[in-house]
């Protein structure tokens, strides 16, 4: 476990930048004006999966926004692990109620506060 924690600490800045890249994309699926941003977010997630070591990634078309799929088969006889999530966000309106830009993550008191994301 200590090797893992050391690795995370050594690469923390890179991890944050990769996370911030996604948070900065206003991927608002409820508003058709943001269709290009949804496509951009899907492509960014696909790229992140590839960088994380997935040997196969794919954008699977749907009637709405694409499903982002990635896999890495280490040994077909081992159990499968599935990670499921979403890459869209809620509309930030009304904007005047935000203290900060909802798509510009900031770090306060060493804690991440991306107003456009929930952790």
Regions found by a protein language model. Give the residues of each.
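N-terminal helical capping/dimerization or prosegment-like subdomains
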Residues: 2-95
């Amino acid at each position: 476990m200590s090797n893992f924690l050391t690795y995370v600490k050594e690469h923390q800045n890179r991890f944050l930048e990769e996370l911030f890249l996604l948070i900065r994309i206003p991927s608002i699926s409820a508003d058709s004006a943001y269709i290009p941003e949804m496509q951009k977010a899907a492509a960014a997630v696909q790229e992140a999966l590839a960088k994380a070591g997935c040997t196969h990634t794919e954008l699977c078309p749907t009637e709405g926004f694409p499903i982002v799929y990635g896999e890495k088969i280490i040994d077909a006889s081992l159990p499968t692990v599935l990670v499921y999530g979403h890459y869209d966000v809620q509309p930030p309106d009304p904007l005047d109620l935000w203290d900060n830009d909802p798509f510009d993550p900031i770090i306060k008191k060493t804690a991440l506060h991306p107003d456009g994301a929930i952790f």
